[in-house]
């Protein structure tokens, strides 16, 4: 009987210690890995998020660690292999879903090596062109595209960039192959579009809105399924409404943890994320970036997981059909 009582007491003590450990989370700084260089859009989102996320995590410091390279797969791989204790998280964008198709030798499995914490924001995209194009709306642009097959240049910011992915889907949707012109970043691509050296580009509102407002490029449509409310873009039709049924592209960001992270920790981080995304200053900063903070069901881990899986299934065939790989 004494042995039994001792065993029960020991079990009770171990359970109590485990509960206390979870209750104390976090008791040290948390690291959010950004799989891209400092200063970029994803880095900016992570730093803004870290400032408000800490409020729901015992006010612990949130450290941003930039681990760039290989289209975001190096940083993601680091998190996949990290201790599943809630102290190493990943903030990634649409590349989380496109990497499995772009890279034929992946160092991790997106769907089985991570816990999904929730979606953070999404950035719409716009189809834009040089000001000397004869078209002034999408209907006219579509006629011009059909009349100039084999002569059209489509710029992007480089292999696997958002503008590259949107451009691939656009070409397949209009069933017209265009000459893809990859640049080393959005800056030089936009410079040549403004200068008239290339014809078209599909890029984030973060990069195009000011140029549209300044009359330096023409805007023909938005890539999202719903019209935008930004004054400079509110009158633009969606590509879906212009006959490209189902066309819906945005650059989104999500938060992830290593597989096996305790549910109690995941729940706490998700609760902190929900609170952070309601912070007025954070919302304003995202709006200034041209991003829309997520407030729908995709904030839930299970729903974000479904969303990412659907994105993988959407982009896989597009990338494979184009035969453009990153490795």
Residue ranges and their predicted role:
Residues 1-4:
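Positively charged n-region of N-terminal signal peptides that target proteins for export
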Residues 6-16:
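Bacterial N-terminal signal peptides
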Residues 22-112, 151-153, 159, 175-204, ...:
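N-terminal (or domain-start) structured segment
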Residues 29, 176, 241, 263-327:
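An extracytoplasmic/periplasmic, membrane-proximal ligand-sensing/linker region
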Residues 44, 48, 52, 74, ...:
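Extracytoplasmic/secreted proteins, especially bacterial periplasmic and envelope-associated proteins
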Residues 81-88, 101-188, 239, 252-285:
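Hinge/capping helix and adjacent helix->loop/strand transition within the periplasmic-binding protein
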Residues 95-105, 169-173, 200-236:
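A ligand-binding cleft/hinge motif common to bilobed small-molecule-binding domains
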């Amino acid at each position: 009987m004494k042995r039994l009582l001792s065993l029960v007491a020991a079990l009770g003590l171990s359970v109590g210690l485990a509960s206390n450990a979870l209750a104390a989370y976090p008791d040290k700084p948390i690291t959010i890995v950004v799989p891209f260089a400092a200063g970029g859009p994803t880095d900016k989102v992570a730093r803004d998020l870290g400032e408000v996320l800490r409020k729901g995590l015992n006010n612990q410091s949130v450290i941003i660690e930039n681990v760039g390279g290989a289209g975001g797969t190096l940083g993601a791989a680091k998190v996949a292999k990290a201790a599943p204790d809630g102290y190493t998280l990943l903030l990634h964008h649409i590349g989380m879903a496109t990497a499995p198709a772009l890279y034929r030798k992946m160092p991790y499995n997106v769907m089985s090596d991570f816990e999904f914490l929730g979606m953070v924001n999404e950035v719409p995209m716009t189809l834009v062109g040089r000001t000397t194009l004869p078209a002034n709306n999408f209907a006219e642009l579509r006629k011009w595209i059909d009349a100039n097959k084999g002569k059209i240049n489509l710029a992007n910011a480089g292999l696997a960039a958002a503008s590259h992915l949107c451009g691939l889907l656009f070409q397949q949707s209009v069933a017209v192959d265009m000459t893809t012109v990859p640049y080393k970043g959005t800056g030089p691509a936009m410079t040549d579009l403004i200068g008239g050296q290339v014809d078209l580009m599909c890029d984030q509102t973060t990069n195009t809105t000011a140029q549209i407002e300044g009359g330096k490029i023409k805007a023909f449509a938005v890539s999202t399924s719903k019209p935008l409310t930004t004054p400079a873009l509110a009158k633009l039709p969606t590509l879906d409404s212009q006959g490209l049924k189902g066309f819906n592209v945005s650059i989104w960001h999500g938060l992830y943890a290593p597989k096996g992270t305790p549910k109690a920790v995941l729940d706490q981080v998700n609760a902190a994320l929900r609170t952070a995304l309601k912070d007025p200053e954070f919302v304003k900063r995202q709006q200034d970036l041209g991003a829309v903070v997520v407030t729908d069901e995709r904030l839930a881990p299970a729903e974000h997981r479904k969303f990412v899986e659907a994105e993988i299934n959407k982009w896989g065939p597009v990338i494979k059909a184009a035969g453009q790989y990153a490795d």
